[in-house]
């Protein structure tokens, strides 16, 4: 057993070391210091929604064409049920983020993405070729200089970490057709939740209250070939009543802890966000949430039965502890910006107590080997992992995350981003590198390469996607 634990940990350490060695030229780059490149979430525990006066509102609209090629593995130990991931896809979309001042301290905010898409597994033309994602649409009222009230669909984000946010409670089911594995982009591009939000700020603190009503019943997890065209998909965001109360108070000049209380359905969670500066270049942060719940496996099987995807009376395909008890989620790390560079590095440790243990992973693979010939077993096994992805939960209990962002890398107007997500239990992982070059104020070209690695009996080595290549062209309007 000791050999099993040590080897993946060593491999994970080697990957992290190699990650930083690849970026070492940036540490000596002679650029202007830009501490603003530290992710805003890591600078201090902010309010749930940062209030922006209408006079400072901006409009951001652009056209983008993104072509993705995804090589697939054909030697999976656990066969992936249909539909298999698309091997290629092209998406042309109009992305809009607009705000209009209606007068009397009232603004109307809209964020959405209109998609035209073609893929090897989608008939063209068809209703799947045209899609619209309504991310946000809400009225914002400012009764006084320190109070804001929002009504409508709002993307509320919480958390100080980068790779995983335990206190980002409204993340569940909100990500639709992601083009990247970068969590900082997924947080911005996801669906908002229909809600009433109130916020009050004062010198040294803030308080935010949110109520999101249930307007529909829970639905089955969507696949790539059954996404609706113009449905706002409130079933993804408003299938249960949800409440959030959060407050931050400045204890000192550089320490403003944030406390959160969240309730959804029959479960209650508490959380906190803590940041502290270490010198001029480093910020350490801790994000924690905890509450009563069952294991990820039990939750997935229960949701599958509730929505009709899995037979109600079928026994669990692998052992699942349905007992609800207090479980913890943690993201701890630091952000570092070297002197005289435009580079920001993040290194984090993630703990998801409800996630797969090493024994759970062995059970998952063994169930397929022993019972995969029984109809429904392999789809049920993959459903558990699809549920984790849909909920934006880590699949495994222990993981590490590394991210680097370098603006004006080597030449002006070139931005490089790289990240790694590593399972500390089996040493498998995902690597992604992105390059964007800003040709002018209105044109950008970019590329992205993704690689999953690990043994066939590992989290990432068992995925059908071996990696991916994305090419994009952006025209700002």
Model regions: which residues?
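Transmembrane beta-strand segments that form the barrel wall of outer-membrane beta-barrel proteins
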Residues: 65-71, 78-82, 111-116, 122, ...
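Membrane-embedded beta-strand positions of outer-membrane beta-barrel proteins
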Residues: 61-67, 110-112, 151, 198, ...
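Outer membrane beta-barrel
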Residues: 99-216, 249, 454
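Detector for outer-membrane/organellar transmembrane beta-barrel domains
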Residues: 252-254, 275-421
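N-terminal periplasmic/intermembrane-space "pro-region" immediately following the signal or transit peptide
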Residues: 25-87, 93-97, 101
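Residues that define the transmembrane beta-barrel architecture of outer-membrane proteins
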Residues: 86-92, 130-135, 190-194, 201, ...
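Outer-membrane beta-barrel "beta-signal"
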Residues: 202, 400-404, 449-451, 463-477
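Repeated loop/turn-to-beta-strand initiation elements of outer-membrane beta-barrel proteins
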Residues: 104-109, 146-149, 204-209, 216-217, ...
